[in-house]
């Protein structure tokens, strides 16, 4: 099984032959990036402990009513949005008809299935048969506007690859101008990496 959901600690462990990509949900609405690296068979670490550990350097108070030690700005949000929480470069930035440019995407639900959907009008990875790939779709929603974002993670376990894509659903009843919408941000917590970038 390439994607393992742990109901108890609300984590998704996406596993290839040699790597793990781990995402978790805290406070029922915040989707966090927890780990990407060497394969981990089971992930049982307390998410709140990790979030507080990464809190060093935060300069504003907590915005979580039930947990004064958590600060949105210090969390490694899986899909950061402009104007909210994560202070790094956002993956998503939209402008609404009323002039607002702030989006707060909350975790809604998930679904896991065999196979990978095509991306209409765009080139993308594919599998010869559905058994070669497993996909996790996570739905996020802005409670104020109704805008939905679906994050897709397709795990090609035998090929050591995870293909990510994002689908944006405008359910706001208004025109929305997308200023930025990228498929992924990945936090690298260890500094011992070599980065190779191919322009084109």
Predicted regions and their residues:
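Contiguous, structured surface segment used for ligand recognition
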Residues: 24-26
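Gly/serine-rich nucleotide phosphate-binding loop at the start of the catalytic core
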Residues: 21
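Polysaccharide-binding surfaces and accessory modules of carbohydrate-active proteins
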Residues: 10-13, 31-200
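Short, Gly/Pro- and small/polar-rich lid/capping loops
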Residues: 1-11
